[in-house]
Amino acid sequence: EIPAAQPSWVHLDYGNPESARWLLQTPLLNDAARESLLGQSNRPKLVRMGETVLLILRGINHNKDHRPEEMVALRIYITPDFILSSRRRSLLSEKDVFQQLVLGGGAISSADWLVEICDALTDRAGEFVEELHDQILELEEIVLMRELPANGRLARIRKQLIMIRRYLSPQRDLVARLANEKLSWLDEDDRRCLLDIADRLRRWLDDLDAGVARSAVLADEINNLTAEATNRRAYQMSVMALMFLPASFLTGLFGINLGGIPGAESPTAFWVFCGSLLALATGLAVWLKYRRWW
């Protein structure tokens, strides 16, 4: 039973069969509202029906065994005196708003609740964007030290940047549009708050764009470092091969089993040959060092 004397908020997990059945059977909703609250679409969306608004907003996923960029859809049906929201996975933002209500300092109207939930979703998104920013700074410091970061770390951060931006961009437009809707239950203070939230989302989007650009530069630097390391190893192997090439030639030449090889009858010929190889290797090393090849 929904109280009629004051604004009410009903929050459901539509993955629960009982909640889904209630949403399908309640006379409070029309077919469009049911489809919105139970549908599969996850993109931010705003549909106005008179003084009623249907919203789909997205929040950062903090659930265990899920990645943050797998954003959670919060579906909202809101009227001047009634709010119905549903989601499949929990959101910290909804808990923030609920906690404020429990403490007695939360929303007192549908408009206040709408501003608070948009604000909470934006704050949580901003926290995650700042975390990504810090991770990029850490990678930049590693690369500046001419070291290679852990394999796949940059690719994961870049993917998160792109996916978060994919949902925050339409959500920014949605909040700005919501502030301009001529709804009787939204006053000027509420509209200013929503426009401020849209502006904060725009700043987070700018940070995400900058993060994508910086990650591209980092990828180039990491590729350059990898190429340099590969070239350095190949060069070292080439120098080693150059040093052993004369020795390989001489050992092959003197190793043939033919008569008339110089020193074949001398007991000291082997040591003389080893000394000659050592002198040749030393001379070649000095020459390479002089030519700055080594």
Protein language model annotation of sequence segments:
Residues E1-D187, D196, R200-R203, D207-A210, ...:
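Peripheral, non-transmembrane regulatory/ligand-interaction domains of membrane transport proteins
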Residues A179-R191, A216-A227:
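Long amphipathic alpha-helical coiled-coil segments
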Residues R202-W294:
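Hydrophobic alpha-helical transmembrane segments and their immediately adjacent juxtamembrane loops
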